[in-house]
Amino acid sequence: SIACNQQQRVDISPLNLLVYPMMPMVRSRVLDLLHFSQLPAGQNAMVAVMSYSGYDIEDAVVLNKASIDRGYGRVVISKKQVFSLKKYPNGTQDIIKAPPRREEQKGMDDATWERLFEHYKPLGEDGIVEVGVYVKVRTDWVHSYVHGDILVNKEIPVNTGDFIGDNCTYIVIDIMFSNTAAPVKYKENGGYVDKVLITTTDNEYFLIKAMVRDMRVPELGDKFSSRHGQKGVVGLITGQENMPFTNAGIYPDMIMNPHGFPSRMTVGKMMELLAGKAGLYDGERKFGTIFGGTNVEDCAEILVQHGFSYCGKDVMYSGTYDKNGLC
């Protein structure tokens, strides 16, 4: 989250927004100053710190596919598409034309019309892409060509530098000031047009900005990070039936390797894990500042009162093999 009006802004690209932001279970002085409770920028995950497979070495993490299907780590990415209509010294300028219509091509069958002009469908009557339509890059495997949907049906002058002389005929003038098609095509991943802004620049050029919104889910190679900067890439996304589980039937959202703690020396993250688990059962957000925060012994006592280990460890059962281990 960057501001309260980020849904109305078109000056930031790409704009990454978490779909389900959550208030952190463990807070600190810096988070209170930044008002992360009102503008959260993360999700609370059920993390199992254990060495479970070879897919979590070198700071890699293992994700639960069922958690991803429930919305864990889902983001909305908005990218800006900018187009301009220029004016040239000889008085010519770029123009926008209306998209071709079906009734204008009477001798063309429907299949040919769809193949040749389907990428003009997102355009409105003014030749500019409409809000709410889906744009993408279309692939025609039969005729072996790839083209993106048209965002602006723009035409540019053929001649942009020569002026008209006194001895020019009407035919020469018509040739010199004719336009050629230069439609602006979409070249990114498919998405929905969120908003369209038409404005002008300092040079009196027309400027058209379109924000295209796309939904993304975590995939292999994506980087995750905790609030302590303990980051790692996704090494494996597996089904919930393959994940370890506790005797209470709790499956983790993520598995991270414990060998990353000694090398990174992130002792505060160990305290955050213990305080977060204690706050989950105590119903109180803990203070995770390493100096002067919530006492670690108090968090351990809370865990003991709720039937857990003093050190925060749990016995988990493998979903793949007939084994159990500590987490």
Name what the model sees in each region:
Residues 1-327:
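Conduit-forming functional cores of very large proteins
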